[in-house]
Amino acid sequence: MMNLKPLTFLPFFSRLVFLSGVIYNTAWANTVIPVDNSRPDETFSRTSPKQHLFSQKPKPAEPTSSASSQQISLTIEQLASRPDLVLRALIPALKNNDMRGVEILLPIYAKQSPDPFLLKWAQAVVARKQGKLNESVRLYRQIIAEKPNLQPARLQLAIALTQNRENEAAKAQLNQLRSENLPAPLLTLIDSYIDAINQRDSWNVYGGVNYLHENNVNNAPPKGTKVEGFTPSSQPEKAHGLSYFINFSKNWSLAHGFFTEFSADINGKYYWDNHKYDEFSTRLNLGGGYRNAKTEVKLMPFVEQFWYVGGENATKDARTLHRYSKSSGINLDVDYWLTPNWKMSTVLEYTEQRYIQPQRQNSNGNSYSVSNTLIYMPNSQQFWFVGLDYYQKNTQLKAYAFERQGIRLGWGQEWSKGISTRLQTSYATRTYQAPSAEKNTIFAPSFFKVVQKNREYGVNFTIWHRSVHWLGITPKITWAYQKTTSNNPFSEYDRNRIYLTFSKNF
């Protein structure tokens, strides 16, 4: 694996061009334009970008003096009178990332009834060459939204994102490219580039805001529930507001792939029409690990504080946040690419939790969680995943302690016309350690005297448009449905939520 500590882009592109199937030794000196005069496909949409970009054997150039030469040289003035030749020169220049050639051809092509898609691609290339990275990224995202299988443009987007210091977004594009059927040398090069991104030690900031529309913010059973003459103490409550989150993180690279990391997470909810459910939390993480292009192992001790107005236990007009609980623990996170198409992600966490209010201290205890997810990416436009989860909460009062086992299934897709979707379904069982009431308790329903067992169902569907950006922010609409059935009727509920998410990497 090559040493890419000083992240440079010229060597990277020189290797890409070497591997490219359509290579043109263009000098572009003295405004003389070499033109590939071989017969192209009739329409650009019928070309196969992946085939051209990732073919391993470059086509040998024929002598320009030969009568059968496939390349001719024209001045800009001569080329301007031949729109067909402009197009034949522009397409390979775009696919081969020939920024100088595209910069020369763009003004000519723009005056010749240009194809809007090719014009936008050329503008993206020129914007990147001129250092207008925000504009270039915006145009490339629109291009990928329209043609998600256009791998040369996706690769150019990844480079533009890296140059613009949008490291996580760049890695996401490179990982999508790895799922394609690429030659081994190019896969190695992409891995090396991911390694180089990993060695950047700049601060990363990620945050977002969700609009919340809650019909059952307190997870109460349906209105009118009555069993054995008993009615639940709570009724479903509505709430509208915002949730927000922000993450700050910084890595310090050490030798041989090791690193230390600090991160801070801030999360909260604010309901303008039901403040008693407002909440706020902070979590600080400090640890380290090891990573390369295929593997990342990270061990992060953490401390966390949680503030809450009080929920159902608070007065109707309450709105002051109070310290509710504090936690500390350790998190182990392992990501490993089994192949270019298969990835395994495992997270283990141990937590000690203590409640501040005396009446809640019988819930003090610890918890263990394990989450294992297998991801399959057949290509850069699609992924599937299956996950298994285990969570165990131990408390002083056994009626509050439980064990939860779950499974998740998901599918993500980049569609044509710029639409992207993500679907996740989940199922879990939750079994408590002890009944809520003793068997000889008189004033308690019978279902309080047996161990509670729940079945939990969930569906999440998110949709967004990849080319819709404002200041680097992509809005996403999510519908979330949760349903719980139980042998305790007072713990049964269903919950529909629709929220609009605005998030951004800074």
Residue positions per predicted region:
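Gram-negative bacterial Sec-dependent N-terminal signal peptides
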Residues: 1-31
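Gram-negative and organellar
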Residues: 30-75, 83, 90-96, 103-107, ...
